[in-house]
Swiss-Prot record:
Chain positions with Phosphoserine modification: 16, 64, 136
Name the UniProt record assigns to this protein: Large ribosomal subunit protein eL18A
Principal cellular location given in the protein's record: cytoplasm
Database matches in PANTHER family: 60S RIBOSOMAL PROTEIN L18, LARGE RIBOSOMAL SUBUNIT PROTEIN EL18
One example GO MF annotation: RNA binding
Name of the encoding gene: rpl1801
Record organism: Schizosaccharomyces pombe (strain 972 / ATCC 24843)
Amino acid sequence: MGIDIERHHVKKSQRSKPASENVYLKLLVKLYRFLARRTDSRFNKAILKRLFQSKTNRPPISISKIAALTSRKSASSQNKTTVVVGTVTDDERMLTVPKLSIAALRFTKSARARILKAGGEVLTLDQLALRAPTGSNTVLVRGKKHAREAYRHFGFGPHKHKAPYVRSEGRKFERARGRRKSRAFKV
């Protein structure tokens, strides 16, 4: 007779593989699963976990944010390769791009062109695995998760200043009671 485990029919909550059917992503998962198992490196485990994540949990990061992060750190971290498990985007407000070494899942066309023009280097995650199998001389960064427009609406309640989902955005809609002091109360 078998033993009935307490959590018998309960699935594990964390992902063990990406939901996407993208073959290139699956190859990267295969590679980093091997590296996470064979090397005693927390870096590879972190990369693998992030490869499993949904697109909303892999937010983009701009080259201006990466430049700010690398310049703010000490001189030793300026020579490191910045690793992003997500998209690296361009920032037109940034007039001059410093020399950067970035490895990412993907780059926008303009971001790639500007990094290369500045004398920097653009790496894919499989090229990074050849160069730094244990993640040495790298710094792992990610974009802001709450920058999406949808986050403006989450957690609605009194005194939260969250944006309502409105039918229309005219003068008569969502502008009176509860939105201004002169009409009963303001949250």
